[in-house]
């Protein structure tokens, strides 16, 4: 078949060369001018190909890039081509296969691959293959080199990947995952997971600390995150000893002012909460070994703190990421009655979006089919929370506690206090009512105010001039399961 030259794409990430060889292109141009015939180039049609911030369909060149350049220089509009696969491939999931096919084609003929080209291909494939499905032997056969050469090229990458895989296993194990669950995540057998858990030790941590190394160095040394490094270092210490080692003061009153997030715990995330707040909740309302359930995990602050304080943790979120294997995908639709864990938790740490406060930020984490609750109307938001509280009540044990963190929301923007419409507000009193009506007895109310420093001086001055009263109220409500809540005629009834 013949294709329009302008419709073809050269993708350097899958084309196995450091760059085009101008001498080869020039030789092909000279051959074309005297009527030489060239074999067809090899192409592949793909979708999900990223171009200028959008995903498109494209036709990629797998073999014949120098012929393509030569045909362009000679003014040809079309070029003969053959397809590798008749089926259009998903570029995102087929990139390694495309790279391997291109490499094999360019190893056999034409302007053959240099040793540097082959080395880079092997490293690209290895870095894109954390499950190590491409063995050194298989790569050697494709690239036309001996296995030992490939070993030399990619040994450092494979070592990091094995270390990373082992770190994931250790992390999930310490968070209370079963070996069967871990095996599914890392693609190993349960027996192999058991071996790694049993044989991995980090005794060198104390030695490194005694030599003056800090925790940042230790985390990098073991290719692990800081939270896991701290978890290993503080293992066996009491909660109070851990607070001291982490440099956190322990608050003994019901007002927790933590305005700064501790960068050691959790990822950068909309509405990220301070790790100290989570740690205080665990200290007062759980014991080591308890299971914590985080239904909207976000950047993973709760699981990181649970890791350090030796609590088990099951985390879920609408938006997941590769660097957070402990956070599993779940879209909450309380109406369908699906509860994603079988073991009953000791504490639910529920930190949902604070109504519409971060609607724009959360929008990027969701989609039309599974929207963030920050996009809900007031009625939809309240109904969601009521349904979640009821669903949770039906799936926990008698003494399970709910730690519910939320902030007052008032429509005070550009509105003087006297003219605010309270019908648009959602405050802690509403959340207290919802919990009580769905079978939860509130036992503690802890004030955790948001920082007022997020307002500029000009904003504050305008608020004064217009008599606008802002809100920085945020409250942690602790409630325990109490009674049985059932719905009759669209109203909740509590049976004690």
Language model features with spans:
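Hydrophobic (often cysteine-bearing) scaffold residues that line and stabilize catalytic clefts
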Residues: 21, 118, 270, 274
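Short, charged/polar connector segments at secondary-structure boundaries
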Residues: 1-85, 261
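Key DNA-contact positions within bacterial/archaeal DNA-binding proteins
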Residues: 148, 191, 227
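Generic structural signal for well-ordered alpha-helical scaffold segments
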Residues: 29, 33, 123-127, 279-283, ...
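Class I S-adenosyl-L-methionine-dependent methyltransferase catalytic core
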Residues: 170-174, 178-187, 195-496
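Exposed loop/turn and edge beta-strand positions of beta-sandwich/beta-sheet ligand-binding modules
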Residues: 55-57, 163, 473
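Amphipathic, charge-rich alpha-helical segments that serve as recognition/docking helices
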Residues: 15-18, 29, 69-175, 198-200
């Amino acid at each position: 078949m013949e294709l329009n030259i302008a419709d073809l794409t050269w993708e350097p990430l899958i084309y196995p060369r450091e760059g085009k060889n101008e001498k080869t292109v020039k030789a092909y141009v000279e051959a074309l001018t005297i009527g030489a015939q060239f074999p067809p180039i090899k192409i592949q049609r793909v979708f999900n190909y990223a171009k200028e911030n959008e995903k498109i369909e494209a036709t990629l060149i797998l073999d014949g890039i120098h012929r393509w350049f030569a045909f362009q220089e000679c003014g040809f509009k079309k070029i003969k081509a053959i397809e590798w696969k008749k089926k259009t491939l998903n570029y995102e999931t087929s990139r390694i296969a495309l790279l391997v096919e291109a490499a094999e084609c360019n190893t056999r003929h034409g302007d053959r691959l240099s040793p540097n080209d082959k080395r880079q291909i092997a490293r690209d494939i290895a870095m894109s293959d954390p499950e190590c499905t491409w063995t050194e032997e298989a790569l050697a056969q494709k690239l036309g080199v001996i296995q030992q050469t490939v070993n030399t090229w990619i040994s450092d990458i494979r070592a990091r990947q094995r270390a990373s895989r082992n770190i994931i296993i250790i992390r999930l194990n310490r968070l209370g995952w079963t070996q069967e669950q871990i095996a599914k995540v890392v693609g190993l057998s349960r027996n192999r997971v058991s071996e790694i858990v049993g044989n991995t030790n980090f005794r060198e941590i104390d030695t490194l600390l005694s030599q003056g190394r800090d925790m940042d160095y230790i985390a990098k040394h073991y290719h692990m995150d800081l939270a896991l490094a701290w978890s290993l270092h503080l293992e066996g210490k009491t909660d109070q000893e851990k607070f001291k080692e982490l440099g956190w003061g322990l608050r003994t009153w019901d007002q927790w002012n933590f305005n700064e997030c501790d960068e050691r715990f959790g990822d950068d995330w909309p509405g990220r909460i301070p790790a100290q707040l989570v740690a205080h909740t665990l200290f007062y309302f759980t014991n080591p070994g308890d299971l914590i359930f985080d239904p909207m995990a976000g950047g993973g602050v709760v699981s990181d703190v649970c890791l350090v304080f030796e609590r088990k943790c099951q985390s879920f979120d609408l938006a997941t990421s590769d660097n957070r294997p402990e956070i599993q995908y779940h879209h909450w639709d309380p109406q369908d009655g699906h509860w994603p864990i079988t073991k009953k938790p000791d504490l639910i740490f529920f930190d949902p979006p604070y109504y519409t406060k971060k609607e724009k930020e959360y929008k990027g984490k969701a989609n039309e089919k599974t929207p963030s609750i920050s996009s809900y109307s007031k009625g939809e938001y309240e109904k969601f929370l009521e349904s979640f509280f009821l669903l949770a009540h039906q799936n926990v044990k008698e003494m399970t506690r709910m730690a519910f963190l939320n902030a007052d929301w008032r429509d005070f923007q550009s509105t003087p206090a006297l003219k605010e419409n309270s019908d648009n507000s959602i405050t802690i009193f509403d959340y207290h009512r919802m919990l009580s009506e769905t079978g939860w007895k509130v036992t503690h109310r802890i004030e955790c105010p948001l920082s007022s420093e997020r307002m500029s001086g000009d904003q504050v001055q305008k608020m004064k001039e217009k008599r606008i009263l802002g809100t920085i109220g945020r409250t942690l409500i602790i409630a325990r399961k109490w009674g049985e809540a059932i719905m009759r005629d669209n109203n909740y009834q509590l049976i004690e």
